């Protein structure tokens, strides 16, 4: 108890240094806790899945087109999985662009079609009603979607009409799990409603304990025909991927990009690095300032050792003082986190909720951090000579060197953060302002066809009705005075599409992305034709390659460019080659860092439910009003979903913007923490030199000489830290961007700017104290010192 009281008394007496130390550690801990909570949330995605390491999703690889699916869709080669190995089986079909109608109003929804077994494997909180999918008309809604449709009204038992024309009865309302989920949906309908949709189902298995998954995956790696090889020689393989890995497997293609979230391990590595840098900066600052306050007690420790004090008592005293500081710092850190919760949620694009992890994290900090921060002070004073401790009260060359060394390491870490922040901002600026190679301005991407996706309801009458509505829509589009060009398709110009291998006349093959386009496509997006020409109204399919595809197939000119699909060649060895009519300029149809994708364009009248529409400047609202009237006249509801291509392209760099913002914020906090440490150290060091300054002034030293004397040491530390940090930062940035096709140069400008930024802020921190010291009255100091 006496030791605790003594520790509190000592910290209270050194209140200036205690407050500085407390603030520096609190800011560092707050940053680290925020990042660790985010990293933990990313690493625990889909933990609402019971035993996610034993629940597996099926991944199908159809000749390079990899995605979540089911081998049940391919009936030619039978796949046999021993039923004794399967504990639970379910499947779900994602319908991203689905809709329901309530009282004549259309509501767009992300739907999954599944059975009750799905909810045995994946736990969702039930807020109202019951989880029941035993009837064909049963439907479950997520809370947010139910509120959007019904407001505060109780939706249980209410009827809504699905896009397939059938009425559904709301059985239950679901909440969101506390963890992040890779699958997002608004509505759940029963597999008994229909078994055939326009999207493939994804099979989910829970295998019995002891099942050899590696053996099953070896069985799945054997190529099998997707269909009868007489007319389709494509082959597929399958594998079982545990749910804990699905979120990280972004190689799986998904046409439902708003229903599936994927994580980035490289992003987690970056955030882990930032977290460690912030933690080290805070800890070094904390230990350095604490050691500085302990210098005043050198005589006390020396005398205690002479009179037989043991190391245990010394360690307990140091540990208690550190624990008290860390407890208060942790409280301030959580206060900071609570106050900044809304902007942090926006920055990290997540919704943090308090979980047991927060408690364990705080407990871990309280248990481990005092031990870590107590080790060096204990070793220094416990194993040092008592005579040296007595002689070095307040000042010694050795203590000055150790303080400057700690400060230097802090500045190395700060420079790494600042340089990284500057580089990532430059990279982001490059990404946002580099033209992708196609027109993005005044392009509307809209879903205008709203028909049933239920193939069980297919009939000739329904087909004719849908065809008539689509024809009426196209006629209205052609008649619109606010449309320059339009293209109907399934994917927009920047979305993933299907691909396959193509072979040239020499037998060389390359994987090409396939896009089905109209002749207007190239004019609408201002894509230059470099060789050949594209017919205005092709009588049959015409093929066009981009420059990247020409390079991939080793074509030097259009004259030698002819290809055949590998699938077709395997089916018929004498299959004719398709000549290439034109070569177009490369453009970036995804993230710039991935480069241009080798693409073959099949130019025909093929179309889909999505329309890409180019409109004149200033006609956006006129176009939207026209389309709403058109939708009202054809489908009876004016609502439709749309985006603008310019916004879609910017959204490609959403994660880059997040990383750049994180670096900016945490680099500034690192500078602030380092400056707090610098302020505390300089407050102590300069005060110790008042007598020296007074003597120098008495002997005629001018203000310039004193400024040089007092600034010199800190400038030397800053310069040395910069020299060490530059090659480390260069290496880390170079390694991270090694695979980027488009990247900002690592010029000296960012290093010089980082030096100026840190130096100006740091020297500004010092200026007040140095100016005060340089203006002291020598006579007053000589009397009091």
Regions found by a protein language model. Give the residues of each.
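Hydrophobic alpha-helical transmembrane segments of multi-pass inner-membrane transport and secretion
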Residues: 13-40, 262-299, 402-427, 657-691, ...
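Hydrophobic alpha-helical bundles that form the membrane domains of multi-pass transporters
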Residues: 261-341, 345-346, 360
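Structured, solvent-exposed hinge/loop segments at the ends of secondary-structure elements
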Residues: 32-153, 162-167, 218, 425-529, ...
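Small-residue-rich transmembrane alpha-helices
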Residues: 30, 34-37, 239, 288, ...
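Generic structural signal for small/hydrophobic residues in well-ordered secondary structure
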Residues: 11, 21, 42, 58, ...
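Intracellular coupling helices
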Residues: 4-20, 24, 284-325, 383-393, ...
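Mid-to-C-terminal secondary-structure elements
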Residues: 115-127, 139-263, 475-651
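Membrane-helix entry/capping segments
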Residues: 4, 9, 13-14, 49, ...
């Amino acid at each position: 108890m006496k030791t605790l009281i003594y520790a509190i008394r000592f910290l209270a007496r050194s209140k200036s240094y205690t407050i500085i130390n407390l603030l520096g550690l609190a800011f560092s801990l707050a940053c680290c806790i925020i990042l660790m909570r985010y990293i933990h949330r990313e690493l625990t995605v889909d933990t609402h899945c019971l035993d996610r390491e034993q629940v597996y999703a099926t991944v199908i690889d159809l000749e390079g087109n990899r995605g979540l699916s089911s081998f049940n869709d391919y009936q030619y080669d039978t796949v046999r999985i021993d039923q004794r190995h399967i504990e639970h089986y379910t499947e779900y079909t994602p319908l991203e662009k689905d809709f329901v109608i309530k009282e004549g109003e259309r509501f767009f929804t992300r739907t999954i079609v599944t059975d009750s077994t799905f909810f045995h494997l994946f736990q969702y909180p039930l807020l109202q009603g019951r989880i029941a999918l035993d009837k064909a008309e049963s439907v479950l809604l997520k809370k947010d979607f139910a509120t959007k449709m019904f407001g505060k009204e109780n939706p249980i038992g209410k009827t809504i009409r699905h896009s397939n024309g059938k009425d559904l009865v709301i059985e239950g309302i679901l909440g969101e799990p506390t963890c992040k989920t890779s699958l997002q949906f608004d509505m759940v309908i029963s597999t008994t409603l229909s078994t055939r949709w326009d999207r493939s189902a994804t099979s989910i298995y829970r295998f019995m304990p002891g099942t050899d998954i590696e053996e099953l995956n070896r069985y799945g790696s054997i190529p099998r025909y997707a269909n009868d090889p007489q007319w389709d020689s494509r082959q597929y393989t399958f594998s079982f991927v545990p749910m804990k890995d699905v979120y990280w497997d972004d190689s799986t293609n998904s046409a439902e990009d708003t229903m599936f979230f994927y994580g980035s391990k490289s992003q987690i590595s970056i955030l882990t690095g930032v977290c460690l840098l912030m933690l080290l900066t805070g800890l070094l600052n904390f230990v350095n300032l604490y050691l500085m306050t302990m210098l005043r007690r050198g005589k006390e420790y020396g005398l205690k050792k002479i009179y037989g004090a043991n190391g245990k008592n010394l360690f307990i005293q140091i540990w208690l003082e550190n624990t008290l500081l860390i407890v208060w710092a942790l409280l301030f850190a959580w206060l900071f986190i609570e106050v900044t919760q809304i902007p942090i949620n926006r920055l990290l694009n997540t919704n943090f909720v308090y979980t047991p992890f927060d408690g364990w994290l705080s407990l871990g900090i309280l248990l481990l951090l005092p031990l870590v921060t107590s080790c060096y002070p204990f070793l220094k004073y416990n194993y040092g000579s008592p005579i040296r401790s007595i002689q070095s009260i307040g000042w010694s060359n050795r203590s000055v060197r150790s303080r400057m060394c700690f400060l230097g390491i802090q500045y190395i870490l700060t420079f790494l953060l600042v340089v990284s922040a500057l580089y990532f901002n430059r990279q982001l600026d490059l990404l946002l302002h580099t033209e992708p190679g196609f027109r993005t301005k005044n392009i509307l991407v809209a879903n205008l066809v709203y028909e049933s996706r239920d193939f069980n309801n297919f009939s000739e009458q329904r087909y004719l009705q849908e065809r008539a509505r689509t024809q009426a829509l196209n006629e209205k589009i052609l008649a619109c005075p606010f449309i320059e060009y339009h293209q109907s398709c399934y994917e927009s110009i920047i979305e993933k599409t299907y691909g396959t291998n193509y072979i040239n006349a020499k037998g060389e093959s390359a994987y090409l992305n396939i896009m089905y386009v109209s002749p207007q496509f190239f004019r609408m997006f201002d894509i230059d034709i470099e060789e050949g020409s594209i017919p205005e109204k092709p009588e049959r399919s015409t093929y066009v390659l981009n420059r990247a595809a020409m390079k991939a197939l080793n074509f030097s000119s259009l004259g030698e460019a002819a290809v055949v699909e590998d699938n077709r060649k395997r089916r018929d060895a004498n299959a004719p080659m398709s000549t290439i009519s034109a070569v177009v300029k490369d453009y970036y149809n995804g993230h710039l860092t991935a480069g241009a994708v080798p693409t073959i364009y099949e130019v025909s009248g093929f179309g889909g439910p999505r329309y890409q529409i180019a409109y004149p400047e200033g006609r956006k609202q006129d176009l939207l009003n026209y389309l709403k009237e058109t939708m009202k006249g054809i489908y009876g509801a004016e609502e439709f979903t749309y985006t603008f291509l310019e916004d879609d392209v910017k959204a490609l760099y959403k994660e880059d913007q997040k990383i750049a913002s994180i670096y900016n914020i945490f680099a500034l906090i690192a500078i602030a923490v380092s400056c707090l440490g610098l302020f505390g150290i300089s407050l102590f060091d300069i005060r110790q030199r008042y007598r020296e300054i007074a003597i120098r002034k008495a002997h005629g030293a001018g203000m310039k000489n004193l400024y040089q004397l007092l600034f010199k040491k800190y400038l030397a530390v800053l310069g040395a830290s910069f020299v060490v940090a530059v090659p480390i930062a260069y290496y880390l940035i170079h390694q991270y961007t090694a695979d980027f096709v488009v990247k900002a140069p690592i010029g000296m400008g960012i290093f010089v700017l980082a030096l100026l930024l840190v130096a100006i802020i740091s020297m500004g921190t010092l200026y007040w104290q140095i100016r005060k010291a340089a203006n002291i009255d020598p006579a007053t100091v000589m009397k009091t010192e």
